[in-house]
Amino acid sequence: MRILEFDEKRQAAKLHIESEDDLWILHLILEKGDKVVAKTTRDIGLGKESRRIPMTIVLKVDYTEFQEFTNRLRIHGIIEDAPERFGIRGAHHTINLDIGDEIIIIKQQWNKYALDKLKKQADKRSKIIIALVDFDEYLIAIPFEQGIKILSEKSLRSLNEEEGIIEQNALEVATELAEYVKQYNPDAILLAGPGFFKEEVAKKVNNILKNKKVYIDSVSSATRAGLHEILKRDIIDKIMSDYEIAIGAKKMEKAMELLAKQPELVTYGLEQVKNAVEMGAVETVLLIEDLLSSNNQERLAIERILEDIENKRGEIILVPKESPIYFELKNLTGILAILRFRIN
């Protein structure tokens, strides 16, 4: 995301959308009553027929829809301003926001949390492709902020089939991996697996892709369970420390350990977390995305809590539905805090 302009007087942010993550962030930030200015198209009656006419409109937001990995955010609302000749003011309309589009978001008042989220997203540039490889199977995935996208998950030919099969299988994996690297242009590649096959794949990858950094690590399997395992590792933090999906998994693991050994250093539930925040006791809070994407009083209460946490130098981690810890956190009320010190 690029922040092209921020007009403090109008409380208007002009943004250029560059990725699926950007669309997901806007889905969380946009609220009922906000205004957006964007290009769109609409069917307009012209005599006996109608045509889809491009135009720029001002839309008062009712709600948004985001579907993971579709490259589109749908913004529903009422048209507040549009070219007079079309006579569509007051009509319901949906803006389809895509990667590459520009949009102006106008709020009555941008809160610190939403502004910081925009700035953090604008600063975020790193991308990584993860390939888990074993002699008989492999998995290729790419993390986005809204979750992990599985690009490929396949079996390989048996080692007993013919001579030289290890080298052939390594070339097959490296070739497919190289295609995804060309498509997504990541900053780094992480190759991991239980045996030495990952080194064979790394050699092939380095021959095909000369200018990409390849990290190698061990993992118990080249499966989704292995993917969950690697997301908790320090190597992920080293490569992509700003991706909350990896950080969230590690923080949740820490919270579960504390609940087992020092339960007084963890609290969950909206009121309990709010009380801990007021006492300045919160080190880290994890919350599921649903709590910020609803249009109700609970969302407003949570936003105030998040602002208070940031003012007291606490850490905030949003957990999307696609995160491996989403349901675990949801079962604990959807919001959990790791504390700096014990409270009554």
From Swiss-Prot:
The keyword Transcription does not apply. Gene3D superfamilies: 3.30.1330.30, eRF1 domain 2 (3.30.420.60), Pelota, domain A (2.30.30.870). SMART domains: eRF1_1. The lineage of its organism: Archaea, Thermoproteota, Thermoprotei, Sulfolobales, Sulfolobaceae. It is found in: Cytoplasm. Belongs to the eukaryotic release factor 1 family. Pelota subfamily. It comes from the Archaea. Keywords: Cytoplasm, Endonuclease, Hydrolase, Metal-binding, Nuclease. It comes from Saccharolobus islandicus (strain L.S.2.15 / Lassen #1). Pfam families: eRF1_1, eRF1_3. Its cofactor is a divalent metal cation. GO terms for cellular component: cytoplasm. One of its GO terms (molecular function) is metal ion binding. The N-terminal domain has the RNA-binding Sm fold. It harbors the endoribonuclease activity. This is Protein pelota homolog. May function in recognizing stalled ribosomes, interact with stem-loop structures in stalled mRNA molecules, and effect endonucleolytic cleavage of the mRNA. May play a role in the release non-functional ribosomes and degradation of damaged mRNAs. Has endoribonuclease activity. The gene is pelA. GO terms for biological process: nonfunctional rRNA decay; nuclear-transcribed mRNA catabolic process, no-go decay; nuclear-transcribed mRNA catabolic process, non-stop decay; ribosome disassembly; RNA surveillance. Monomer. It is an enzyme of class 3 (hydrolase). Its EC number is 3.1.-.-. InterPro entries: eFR1_2_sf, eRF1_1_Pelota, eRF1_3, Pelota/DOM34_N, Pelota_arc, Ribosomal_eL30-like_sf, Transl-rel_pelota.
